Amino acid sequence: SAKKIAYAASFGGSEVLPNDKENIKKWLKRYDKITIRENSGVKIANELGVPAEQVLDPTFLLEKSEWEKLIPQRECSEKYVLVYQLHPNKQFDEYAKQYAKKKGLKLYRLSHCFHHIVRSGKFVCCPPIGEFLWYIKNAEHFLTDSFHGTALTHNLPMFCQRVTAKESQVFFSLSATKTEYSKATTTLTLTAKK
């Protein structure tokens, strides 16, 4: 039978509920090899008695030029501020609205959550990866609280909202220590410039 390998899996946080541990252990043991993108996930797997190693997040496996091949070749007819927000945060919502207003630009939101349709701005639900990248590439400014949103931004003025360790171990896994992470980012910090 074919081998089962999990590449760059994620637990989505830094811990699992005690009641879930036995089931998770049972499910993980179905795999011949497990690799995880966050160091906290490797720790969880190892604590469950399942060997795992940390690997590079898949977003970094392609060069910028490879990602760009996925972007549709069409013109953008308007200027906008783009928001890709994963975690509920009214302060971030208000900031995005005011930021777009201050810049005199339209506000666009990309989301996989249909309930985000009620937030301010034009809502784009679940765009395929090429469209997702097209919106990022054509944005005048990009606001996000997402690791993957940050990773796929290439030389674009952007803000990344700091999230808690529980919400996003990915950010912490990319830096050597939490102290370095804290020095490098603060809430709504400018992280890239053209």
Question: PLM features: residue spans?
Answer:
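Active-site anion-handling motifs in enzyme catalytic cores
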Residues: 1-194
